[in-house]
């Protein structure tokens, strides 16, 4: 933007008032503001304005502002009316983001609203739990940190190419905290694995021929010789045998992922855990 345009740039002060976190109001206002790339917007958020006294403090702070748009999500009618009255008296624009929706639903259903502060925020908690589960899955992928096994809702074990990582992420999307461990020949199994409730451990296996083809294709994709120890049938059989011995020792639930989609395997895991659909 040129200096001349900067000097002539219009400025709007966006005042966001909410009796909860204020994310709903902020997102809606921002969605409108981005339609005006040449306008400078100054955002001021006032969350948790839950009574008239707090609201009056906001009014005192913004009373001298110019070019103001007040956007509010206030459940109680007296605070709504106070915000509207203040805006009109000070020649400020305003938008009530909740009342219209609530009134129309009441008109259609005859039901009375419960006037619960922060109801949208509570509803969104499931979303934040899911994000937390996704972060957990990434943090404890491939056995990066053994302590994750003790904190997880599910622990996936399996040799290479048994869908551990995609399964972890799929289950995380169901709000499950998942850690996984690749079973590599001649490597130490972390002590934490033996401390996990066997019901939480899922042993993944595969058909040798399927695993052979998957690994060969993986090597080809990397531009490498497909005939290596990694894809050798004898090596694959030895890996699977070692994995099955570990599963038997742990007493864990075993799933053969051959010819199964991620969704199908995840459904079996959730059924085993007694979960219908964790992400509700």
Curated annotation (Swiss-Prot):
Residues that bind ADP: 158-165
Main EC class the enzyme belongs to: transferase
Keywords from the named record: Kinase, Nucleotide-binding, Serine/threonine-protein kinase, Transferase
EC number: 2.7.11.32, 2.7.4.27
Pfam family, one: Kinase-PPPase
Catalytic activity, reaction form: N(tele)-phospho-L-histidyl/L-threonyl-[pyruvate, phosphate dikinase] + ADP = N(tele)-phospho-L-histidyl/O-phospho-L-threonyl-[pyruvate, phosphate dikinase] + AMP + H(+); N(tele)-phospho-L-histidyl/O-phospho-L-threonyl-[pyruvate, phosphate dikinase] + phosphate + H(+) = N(tele)-phospho-L-histidyl/L-threonyl-[pyruvate, phosphate dikinase] + diphosphate
Gene Ontology molecular function: ADP binding; ATP binding; phosphotransferase activity, phosphate group as acceptor; protein serine/threonine kinase activity
Parts of the chain that traverse the membrane: none
Function: Bifunctional serine/threonine kinase and phosphorylase involved in the regulation of the pyruvate, phosphate dikinase (PPDK) by catalyzing its phosphorylation/dephosphorylation.
Similarity comment: Belongs to the pyruvate, phosphate/water dikinase regulatory protein family. PDRP subfamily.
Protein name: Putative pyruvate, phosphate dikinase regulatory protein
Species of origin: Lactobacillus gasseri (strain ATCC 33323 / DSM 20243 / BCRC 14619 / CIP 102991 / JCM 1131 / KCTC 3163 / NCIMB 11718 / NCTC 13722 / AM63)
